[in-house]
Structures are given as C-alpha cells and as structure tokens.
Amino acid sequence: MITYTKPLSKLIGHFEKFPGIGPRTAQRLALFVLKQPESTIRDFSKALLEAHSNVGRCKKCFNFTSEDECEICKNTERNQKLICVVAETKDLLALERAREFKGVYHVIGGLISPMDSVGPELLEIRSLVERVSKSEIDEIILALTPSVEGDTTSLYIGKLLAPFTKVTRIAYGLPMGSELEYVDEVTLARALEGRTKLN
C-alpha cells in the first residue's frame, strides 16, 4: 500500500469523490495539481468558488444558470410547448449536442430509486406537474436513462401528466443501463425522432 504525505493524501481523497474518478486517476490529478504554478492554482480555486457561489438553478426548468432563467428557457425561438424531461443537466447537454431538439427542458435532478432512498418527493417532479398544468403544453418527451430506475421514473411521470398532455418517451438504440451522456449525437437524434407514446 502506497503511503502519501498527509496533504497529498487529502487532495487525492477529494478528487476520488468526483464521479467517474478512481484512485489512480485521483492520484494523477493530484500530482498534476502539485506541478502547477501557485497562480494557476489560485485562479482554479477562485473559479471553483465563483461557480459554486454564482451558479444556481433556473426557476423554470432547474438547469444550471447564473440568472433567474437559463438561456434555453429565455430563448424565444425555442418551442415552449414542447418539454423534454431529463434526469440531470449532463443529459440536457448531451441532447443539445445532437442539435435535434428545438423545445425546452425540465431537469428533475435524478431518478426514482427506492434502493437509494430516492423517492419522487426528492425530485423536481411536482414542479413539472405544476408547470404542465398551468401552461398549454403540446407534448412531454421523457428522455431518461434506459434502466430500471429510468423506467420506473418514466412510468410515474407518465401517469401524472397523462391528464394534461401527450407524453412520449425517446426510442433507444443502446443497451439497457446505458448513460444518456455517453450516447453519440446521431443515435440521440434518431432516438428523438423515433419516440413512442406513453399515454
């Protein structure tokens, strides 16, 4: 077992908390940081603190923004009557890269997962229902990960929104359990085109 000096060990431990970062990658990142000039580290620290202090959630869709509403919600050229529901902002970004979707989004902040003690009350589902019930929405597209949790969440939301509008789910050309974030743009574009009706 490798023994690090305490400050380095602490830094590696912090990097390991990042999603997708294992012990070896955390070690590489920590060693990279130590090689940087102090001015670079100060700038990086400042950028982290500024982002954490100044970036919040859009009051409409819960995407990240530094204003009350995000750029997508404020864009009058987007179809405000077409809402795509995603679990996380990273999924929204993946769909934006595909350049196929012209509507707006609603970020629910995760998936229903009883095993992880995540119920619907911990997600932005109630705000979605309120948003749909108070507006004229033509269609809700559910773009949630093809997994047990994704299916559960889609069915739950589909039942809640069925009285208000048409609810569809994007088609998938990828295996069960795949993360939306890692799907290529062409597959995502086809998934949007081939969406199926839920209600």
UniProtKB/Swiss-Prot annotation:
A zinc finger (C4-type) spans 58-73. Pfam families: RecR_C, RecR_HhH, RecR_ZnF, Toprim_4. One of its GO terms (molecular function) is zinc ion binding. This is Recombination protein RecR. PANTHER family: RECOMBINATION PROTEIN RECR. May play a role in DNA repair. It seems to be involved in an RecBC-independent recombinational process of DNA repair. It may act with RecF and RecO. It comes from the Bacteria. CDD domains: TOPRIM_recR (cd01025). One of its GO terms (biological process) is DNA repair. Keywords: DNA damage, DNA recombination, DNA repair, Metal-binding, Zinc, Zinc-finger. Residues 81-175 form the Toprim domain. Belongs to the RecR family. It comes from Prochlorococcus marinus (strain MIT 9312).
